[in-house]
């Protein structure tokens, strides 16, 4: 059975941010950004919400509901076929949510800005599936849904680990050069492109 994919409502965007934080909580990248496990889910949820709230203006946020009606999967895409508008009050909002870890988030932004492709594309910023619903094809369904809509427009993403890389390769993404890029503490991300 194919899952029903729908646009997230504006009211759901904080829930999407929290879902991304929960599904990414095991990743070394999140641990690098917020080393304190007691604060990580809150800070990362706020960070993902900050970015997710901007996506409907210049991209899209799609979700899948679980059997109980809660969100179990989400994809956050940005349309980079034209110049993307800045997030209003981004610096102030980032400083407020990141607190003592603000330098880590600045390093992340600098890394991603430096290595982001210039060719027109759609950027898969986040693909998240609730831990209780992973390995059921929901992430792939979300990717397929947008890939079909792109009409041959390329797509880009930053993968976080070997499992992600294998998944994205199955959906037509290839390694870019440079492939791995690193935070100052050597935490890696992996650049991938789908033509």
Walk through the language-model features, giving the residues of each.
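Conserved N-terminal entry element of GNAT/NAT acetyltransferase domains
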Residues: 1-14, 22
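Conserved GNAT-fold acetyl-CoA-binding loop/helix
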Residues: 27-49
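A short helix-loop-beta-strand connector motif used in the catalytic cores of GNAT acetyltransferases and
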Residues: 45-63, 117-123
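Conserved beta-hairpin
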Residues: 57-75, 128
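Conserved acyl-donor/pantetheine-binding loop and adjacent beta-alpha core of acyl/acetyltransferases
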Residues: 74-130, 134, 183-186
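Conserved GNAT acetyl-CoA-binding A-motif
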Residues: 120-123, 149-160
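Conserved acetyl-CoA-binding loop-helix of GNAT-fold acetyltransferases
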Residues: 129, 135-148, 170
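Conserved active-site alpha-helix within GNAT-family acetyltransferase domains
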Residues: 140, 152, 161-178, 184-185
